[in-house]
């Protein structure tokens, strides 16, 4: 009954729009959240390390990323920024090739995002801002192919790819995705990543949200 009283549903992704329809049988309009893409800077001199950052809680799957690099890629470097209740567990999983930096200030995060070879994103998110912050830094994303990531990252089948996906949250599947990325890294340009990230800018959000409110207000005025 409460849902029937809602004038307009706004979803943060098409993924959530489908969920709204499934639960409430109501259509919604998708307005992606604002990403402050201009706060990040591009670096064309990528260094030979992979990167991830997140609050260390179970659904973020940082343990999966660390375990994958420890077991499958002992000669590849992974740097992790973030803290949380799973930090000790993840530290115990980490091999010598994995560096855990814990919580860091934004400038340190920004620096690593711009220099990384790729950003690893293993969570299923309703939207997911971190992959777009990586792309705003000119950095490709290797992401779990479910949820909002499918709308914010352009896979290898796109004319201007910005990353690629893995289909299962397992060490084996992520291992295959990283190996595939290594073979196709030259197909992904920093410029394509930045252009894609700009589609989700904070100015775009303000314009879309204002237009929605203005349109709804005009319609309401016509009906009173």
Where are the language model's segments positioned?
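Conserved donor-binding/catalytic core segment of Leloir-type glycosyltransferases
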Residues: 10, 35, 41-60, 65-73, ...
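Acidic donor-binding loop of glycosyltransferase active sites
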Residues: 114-126, 139
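Donor nucleotide-sugar binding/catalytic pocket of nucleotide-sugar-dependent glycosyltransferases
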Residues: 1-40
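Short alpha-helical donor nucleotide-sugar binding micro-motif in glycosyltransferases
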Residues: 111-116, 135, 209
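Nucleotide-activated donor-binding/catalytic signature segment of Leloir-type glycosyltransferases, i.e.
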Residues: 88-110
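Short hydrophobic beta-strand element within catalytic cores of glycosyltransferases
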Residues: 140-145, 150-153
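A charged, aromatic-enriched C-terminal amphipathic alpha-helix characteristic of glycosyltransferases
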Residues: 169, 183-223
């Amino acid at each position: 009954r409460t849902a029937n009283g809602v004038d307009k549903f706004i979803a943060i992704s098409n993924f959530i729009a489908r969920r709204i329809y499934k639960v409430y049988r109501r259509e919604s309009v998708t307005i992606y959240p604002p990403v402050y893409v201009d706060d990040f800077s591009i670096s064309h001199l990528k260094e030979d390390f992979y990167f991830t950052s997140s609050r260390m809680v179970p659904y973020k799957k940082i343990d999966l990323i660390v375990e994958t690099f420890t077991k499958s890629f002992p000669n590849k470097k992974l740097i992790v920024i973030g803290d949380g209740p799973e930090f000790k567990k993840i530290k115990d999983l980490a091999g010598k090739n994995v560096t855990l930096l814990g919580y860091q200030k934004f400038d340190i995060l920004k620096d690593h995002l711009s220099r990384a070879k790729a950003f690893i994103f293993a969570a299923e998110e309703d939207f997911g801002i971190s992959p777009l912050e990586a792309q705003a830094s000119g950095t490709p994303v290797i992401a779990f192919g479910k949820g909002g990531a499918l709308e914010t990252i352009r896979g290898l089948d796109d004319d201007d790819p910005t990353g690629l996906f893995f289909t299962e949250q397992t060490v084996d599947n992520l291992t295959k995705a990283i190996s595939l990325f290594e073979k196709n890294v030259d197909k992904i340009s920093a410029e394509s990543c930045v252009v894609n990230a700009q589609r989700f800018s904070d100015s775009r959000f303000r314009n879309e949200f204002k237009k929605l409110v203005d349109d709804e207000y005009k319609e309401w005025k016509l009906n009173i």
